[in-house]
């Protein structure tokens, strides 16, 4: 299973959250503390926005199939970047020759001209049976943008297709509604084909101004074919968050600094620190939405109505 990290708030040290914390995103790729039976060796990707930069609406984008732990370019860039919004992802695939490992399959996905980026931690079982049913729900101009072979890129195109303007800048409510609409379509197509195998769909989406994240699974716990059941399939795919003033590194380790007024939100597949006292688990079948206005973070947790 993949690992994902998303952030919205005060400028954050990219090297810190990717490489330096106890359970940094890159460390999770080879030495996770949760769902530790699965290694994420199929590449790294990120989109990072900085409101202080030129063309702040356009994120810095990086993708590489190189193992991120040994990626000197990524380490060098991470030491220099302090984004105000971020989605980063390490990709995990089953270790078979059937998997396609390449740049076109790396998350986050962001079509040319689109404002929304998406990363997915999960797996739609029997996706090959679903793929072409989704064509009727995806706008043709978006379907033509799909370059890879993943279920995740189709989910992304499906979300964009449910926005009034796929190339506009949706607010948190518009993006959350489009995400829920996409999940409903997936449920409908699964039912059409009689697919009822457990399929997690943890998503992180952002425009650089708003952030939406889901912790969700279709038919959790149902595996009709136990011969192909993996140990990593058993737990509900995790997602955690911490909110406060800013994420800091001090003498006693990393933490989200307390603040009377929230300014920053950090979401990750697992807490980035051994001390998880400042972290909360995103409820199952829930969504977090966040918007940052005038240096104040507005966020809420919603039940997913799918």
Where are these regions (language model features)?
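N-terminal segments that mediate ammonia production and transfer
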Residues: 1-306
